[in-house]
């Protein structure tokens, strides 16, 4: 697969720079950190902002959902790697003058570990930040073990619904409950028809035959239900 890349070690920063320039009417970099994208029109300080930290490589998730009625900020990590707890905490601190902050966390081990670390750092500074763990992928855990499911494309419903409501409501607990309701009523199932290619190494993320599809694969190539032949 052909890709237009300048230097591999700058790929994420170049991508973000291009995105911000292309959508400068809606988003901008945080003043001192080019891995934090924020909306141009700031939310009223009486309202609760929504923040997410996630690895790059899933675009337009989540940077494409930063804007009015959506997410207030996205802390971006390397490809398929969550930003560190310190980096996410840096994003949280941008909103410490608000009555509360919701940190959206997609249910993947690195995202959860680093997100919870950021919440702990916020607690130490008496910043009212609360996590909302998001999951929807039915291939990763059975009914009755929903909290073990991975986050997938269904998380975008939370971005939009909670983002719109957060422009109206000021109570963080009510917003958390709404986010949980959206999450608990969302299910997704992915189908992979070909492998992604690492822009760094040029290697395939997984192998799949031309006459196969993979049902239930995770967003990083994690295993799902299995392969199935197609005509």
Predicted regions and their residues:
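N-terminal amphipathic/basic leader segments beginning at the initiator methionine
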Residues: 1-50, 207-210
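Gly-rich Lys/Arg/Thr-decorated short loops/hinges at beta-loop-alpha junctions or inter-strand turns
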Residues: 44-53, 62-75, 139-142, 212-229
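Short glycine-rich or small-residue beta-strand-to-loop segments that form or flank ligand, phosphate
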Residues: 48-55, 71-74, 100-109, 116-119, ...
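Glycine-rich oxoanion-binding loops at beta->alpha junctions
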Residues: 58, 67-98, 231
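Short glycine/serine/threonine-rich phosphate/pyrophosphate-binding segments
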Residues: 59-61, 85-89, 110-116, 140-142
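A glycine- and small-aliphatic-rich helix-loop capping segment at beta-alpha/alpha-beta transitions
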Residues: 65-73, 118-128, 149
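Short, acidic/small-residue loops that bind anionic groups at enzyme active sites
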Residues: 74-79, 123-145
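Internal, active-site/partner-interface "lid" segment
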Residues: 140-150, 159-222
């Amino acid at each position: 697969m052909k890709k237009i890349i300048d230097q591999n070690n700058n790929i994420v920063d170049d991508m973000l720079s291009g995105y911000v320039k292309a959508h400068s009417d809606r988003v901008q970099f945080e003043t001192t950190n080019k891995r934090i994208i924020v909306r141009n029109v700031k939310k009223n300080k009486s309202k609760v902002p929504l923040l997410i930290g996630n690895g790059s490589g899933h675009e337009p998730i989540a940077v494409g959902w930063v804007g009015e009625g959506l997410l207030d900020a996205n802390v971006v990590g390397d490809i398929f790697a969550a930003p560190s707890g310190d980096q996410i905490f840096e994003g949280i601190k941008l909103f410490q003058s608000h009555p509360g902050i919701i940190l959206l966390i997609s249910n993947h081990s690195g995202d959860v570990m680093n997100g919870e670390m950021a919440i702990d750092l916020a607690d130490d500074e008496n910043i009212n930040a609360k996590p909302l763990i998001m999951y929807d992928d039915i291939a990763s855990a059975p009914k009755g073990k929903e909290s073990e499911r991975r986050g997938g494309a269904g998380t975008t419903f939370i971005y939009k619904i909670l983002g719109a409501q957060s422009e109206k409501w000021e109570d963080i607990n009510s917003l958390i409950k709404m986010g949980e309701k959206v999450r608990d009523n969302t299910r997704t199932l992915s189908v992979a028809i070909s492998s992604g290619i690492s822009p760094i190494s040029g290697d395939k993320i997984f192998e799949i035959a031309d006459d196969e599809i993979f049902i239930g694969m995770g967003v990083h190539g994690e295993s799902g239900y299995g392969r199935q032949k197609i005509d």
